[in-house]
Amino acid sequence: MTQWEVVIGLETHAQLSTVSKIFSGAPTQFGAEPNTQACPVDLALPGVLPVLNRGAVERAIRFGLAIGSTIAPRSIFARKNYFYPDLPKGYQISQYEIPVVQGGQITIQVPANEKAGKPAYEKTVNLTRAHLEEDAGKSLHEDFAGMTGIDLNRAGTPLLEIVTEPEMRSAAEAVAYAKSLHALVVWLGICDGNMQEGSFRCDANVSVRPVGQEKFGTRAEIKNLNSFRFLEEAINYEVRRQIELIEDGGEVVQETRLYDPDKRETRSMRSKEDAHDYRYFPDPDLMPLVIGQDWIERVQAGMPELPAAMQQRFVEQYGVSAYDAGVLTSSKAMAAYFEAVVAKAGAANAKIAANWLMGDVSSQLNRDGIEIDAIPVSAAQLALVLQRIADGTISNKIAKEIFSAIWDEKATDEAAADRIIDAKGLKQISDTGALEAIIDEVLAANAKSVEEFRAGKEKAFNALIGQAMKATKGKANPQQVNELLKKKLG
């Protein structure tokens, strides 16, 4: 029986976060009324000329520097010729032979697949190129009985098309790459990453070949996948479709396909064109893009600390594990919040801060469906909660209660934790005499558990601790309760 190898390459369109379009001064705001953000250049009216947006170029340079690519000192804009109703010029301005970003790498972390018995692993994906181009408009098929409406607000919006080598071998690798790329462009501030609005979307080129064969199989391109789940589902379906087709004696044809998320299947859209079908040629209205070393150095000077470097720093500076550092640097906002908490709580509390961010904080964020930059608990407020755990004022259990109270009331005072502790009488009981009296009562009331413990049943000890904590409404110092119980039980 033939064993098949999957071959995947991704082309990702990241909408660059410029205020105006790539070749005109029209705004790029999402959600405006149709055709209210299109100027004569976007409409391709006679006599108008494109003017390149410097901000788009700088964002492309920033991306290239982040992935270790070569920034082309001289690159060319080309006309990609094809007809579509929402492309007024009859061509798209893109880059072909000489893109602005050449090469580069992105390292991905592929999660374990327990069902398949595959462990987690790291992989480096090589990039072919990243080039600047303009987006097309949008065809609107609803609300127009028997007709199609055209909205040109999106026409001319700057895109960075990022192309990988065909090096991914599973949907899991493709999704891991897409997530890493998404996190990077958002981290760099070059794209808002809003997949629902189409700011970040992927085209997947998928083929299969017998294991050991060097020649690639015939590929199908699945267009405009705007969620990581759709990307995974579309690739998995397409792989199954191609294998079944070949094993049944058929042939895979080179074509463009769309993914139907309701049916969870891909369907044919059109035959897939080759580059020569687009009749690329240099755009005579645009001069070659010349990028000097001084320009690159200016962009380099404004680069943020990159996730990989920050992850390593967190391990060395704060003593957190590599895994924890990876989670904490999954977004710039999360990393900034963590460092702000540690700055207030002290470096000695860095590990507990990391645990809280990955535990209670993340849980509450997921519950409310918000991101870390919208968290209602300030870094200073959380830091004080952690300090009160560290100095023995409250237990970890009470700390969770206080954190939830600050969150729910959206408190604005920095000392909210102390206010709530005093108002509700939540200070931890650490007085040895008071705790001994409570423990004596617990032992007297739970003679059976005492006998079971002395007979060697360790679970009975935990039950006694639970009773002591219950008697103090969770306010007893757990460590002291543990020590006093052991002492009294001999």
UniProtKB/Swiss-Prot annotation:
**Which EC number(s) are documented for this chain?**
6.3.5.-
| MF term (GO), any | ATP binding
Task: Please give the superkingdom of this protein's source.
Answer: Bacteria
Any single biological process term in GO: translation
Against SUPFAM superfamilies, the record matches this protein to:
GatB/YqeY motif (SSF89095), Glutamine synthetase/guanido kinase (SSF55931)
Q: Give the catalytic activity.
A: L-glutamyl-tRNA(Gln) + L-glutamine + ATP + H2O = L-glutaminyl-tRNA(Gln) + L-glutamate + ADP + phosphate + H(+); L-aspartyl-tRNA(Asn) + L-glutamine + ATP + H2O = L-asparaginyl-tRNA(Asn) + L-glutamate + ADP + phosphate + 2 H(+)
Any Pfam family matching the protein: GatB_N
Q: Which UniProt keywords apply?
A: ATP-binding, Ligase, Nucleotide-binding, Protein biosynthesis
Q: Where are the transmembrane segments?
A: none
InterPro entries (UniProt xref): Asn/Gln-tRNA_amidoTrfase_suB/E, Asn/Gln-tRNA_Trfase_suB/E_cat, Asn/Gln_amidotransferase, Asn/Gln_tRNA_amidoTrase-B-like, GatB, GatB_C_1, GatB_Yqey_C_2, Gln-tRNA_amidoTrfase_suB_CS
Q: What does the UniProt function comment say about this protein? A: Allows the formation of correctly charged Asn-tRNA(Asn) or Gln-tRNA(Gln) through the transamidation of misacylated Asp-tRNA(Asn) or Glu-tRNA(Gln) in organisms which lack either or both of asparaginyl-tRNA or glutaminyl-tRNA synthetases. The reaction takes place in the presence of glutamine and ATP through an activated phospho-Asp-tRNA(Asn) or phospho-Glu-tRNA(Gln).
Assigned protein family? Belongs to the GatB/GatE family. GatB subfamily.
The record's subunit annotation is: Heterotrimer of A, B and C subunits.
Under the heading HAMAP family, the entry gives: GatB
What's the protein here called?
Aspartyl/glutamyl-tRNA(Asn/Gln) amidotransferase subunit B
Origin species, per record, is Burkholderia ambifaria (strain MC40-6)
